[in-house]
Amino acid sequence: MKKEEGCSRIMSYQGFESRNSSYAERRPRRPFQSTIVSAPDKALLITVAFLVIIGFMAIFSASAPKCIDEGGNPAQFLIKQLICFVVGFFGLKFFTNYDYKKLGAWNLIFAGTVIFLLMLVDFTPLGVTVNGAKRWINILGFQLQPSEFAKPAVVLLLATIFKKDADLLDQNKWVTTFIPILIMLGLIFKQPNLSMVILLLSTSVVMFLAAGGSLKLFFSCLGAMMTTVVIAATTIIKPYQMQRIKTWQHPELDPQGAGYNIIQSLIAFASGGFSGVGYGGSIQKLSYLPECHTDFIFAIIAEELGWVGCVLIIGLFFTLIHRGFMIASRCPDMFGKLLAVGITFSIGFQAFLNISVASSFFPTTGVPLPFISYGGSSLIVSLCMVGVLLNISKKRMKKIRNIENV
């Protein structure tokens, strides 16, 4: 009797197993994610290479007349930019091969170094004043702009602290992250460099949202930020900055003063037309448009290469932004995602600001066009940040479907 009962139980168990096996076969298998290691993103690398090459050509064309007028080498600015490119290229190579997950350990050290350099600019004779703004320090004949290094410093700080959560009320976050960022913002605002402050604040907001931050808290912070901007505009903003805002939409009110650069930039756009006047044929660079190799280099490109050249450059930046956010979406960890989002937005928004200023959509800001404008600090920092992006792109998530039972 016991033997028959045991056999019955065995048969019942076997039937149950058989039914479950049949159900498992009928049930659709859910995909799971696996981290794979691949080569760096080639599309991103090619895009940056094109931007850098266009930058070399534009810098030489825009700066050669000025160098000749001053009795110097026509390629003087290009040579300096090439030297900075070599430094930036080695930085790109290093960060492409350096595991991005180890960068978090350096966040406070790097932020402290940037704060120290900013203090040298603001409070010591080493600071160099150009066009009323004290933003540079001289090192071995080269001018270094520490505020450019604040971009990766802020991104690294926020990625490190937001990788777990986006709680803005956490006391530890204030001590280790928010206070250093506020110190950097204050030192940069003192130079004054309001455009960089806006760029860093915007990057911080985007990273906060990417980390899953509360929209309610975001709009509260946005309201507080707008109130601060209004107060700053009426109290502590510099007179020349207020004049820029006043003449932004009506530059004809002061054609020889604050509106001069905008008017000359718009003339360059109008002269370029659809296909441009040809490489090297710009008239506006002949002492008409100041800073044509830095802040207004996009206007010279528009004049020489026309609408076609403008679309090409904007398309390259859109490609860079697309690849950067794709890298962020495929990254297997939150730290890498936030790094990719912060770097991509920082470069993309800076390009947007520069192009908007050159085309009179925004007031003059003094922000260079990444990879293209003359400026060693901007080029080195941009290439190093792209190196981090390329490193993140080597590790990505892949969904694997229809895994057979072993």
Locate each region found by the language model:
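Transmembrane helix boundary and interhelical junction motifs in multipass membrane proteins
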Residues: N193-I198, V277-S282, C292-T294, W307, ...
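Short, small-residue-rich loop/turn micro-motifs
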Residues: S63, F269, G273, S359
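N-terminal membrane topogenic signal
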Residues: S34-V48
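Hydrophobic alpha-helical transmembrane segments of multi-pass inner membrane proteins, especially
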Residues: L45-I53, A58-S61, I68-N261, A299-S360, ...
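Glycine/serine-rich anion-binding loops at beta->alpha junctions
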Residues: L140-A150, K190-P192, G273-G278, V367-V381
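A juxtamembrane structural motif centered on a specific transmembrane helix
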Residues: K2-Q33, F352-V406
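TM-adjacent membrane-interface loops and short helices in multi-pass inner/ER membrane proteins
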Residues: T247, P251-T294, F298, W307-G309
